[in-house]
Amino acid sequence: MREGLSVGHEAQLELLVSSNEIIRLGGTTPVFSTPSMINLMEHAARKALAPYLEDHEESVGANVTVDHLAATPIGKRVRAVAKVTAIDRALIDFEITAFDETEQIGKGTHRRAVIKMGKL
């Protein structure tokens, strides 16, 4: 891994909730799904690490713990933020949060492991 990554470094990603990211509660109300929220959070963490990876390295998810706090309907924007909280050699811990246009909709922690691509 390249030098320079530090605790506090963060990255963000946004998406507009579409029919691709929803689940229907009780079959009628389409809302942003928990797996889609986690996917966005993980990709924000990956984005935070990307500039520090060597050409032969990749980061993979090793752990995720998330609370989904509020429902978000189709057509609303969601923003995920991943902030580095700890660095232990090849293990990077993140605080992950998600917000829609109204409120915080998710929070949790995520760990990524930096691996050599030849070991996949």
Locate predicted features.
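Conserved N-terminal beta-strand and adjoining loop/helix that marks the start
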Residues: 34-38
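Catalytic strand-loop segment that frames the active site of acyl-thioester-processing enzymes
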Residues: 1-33
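HotDog/MaoC-like acyl-thioester-processing domains
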Residues: 7, 73-74, 83-120
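Flexible, active-site-adjacent loop/turn segments at secondary-structure boundaries
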Residues: 20-21, 29-30, 51, 58, ...
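Hydrophobic beta-strand-centered segment that forms part of the acyl-chain substrate-binding groove
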Residues: 46-79
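Generic structural detector for well-ordered beta-strands
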Residues: 12-18, 67, 109-113
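Short, residue-level hotspots on alpha-helical faces of the histone-fold
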Residues: 39-43, 47
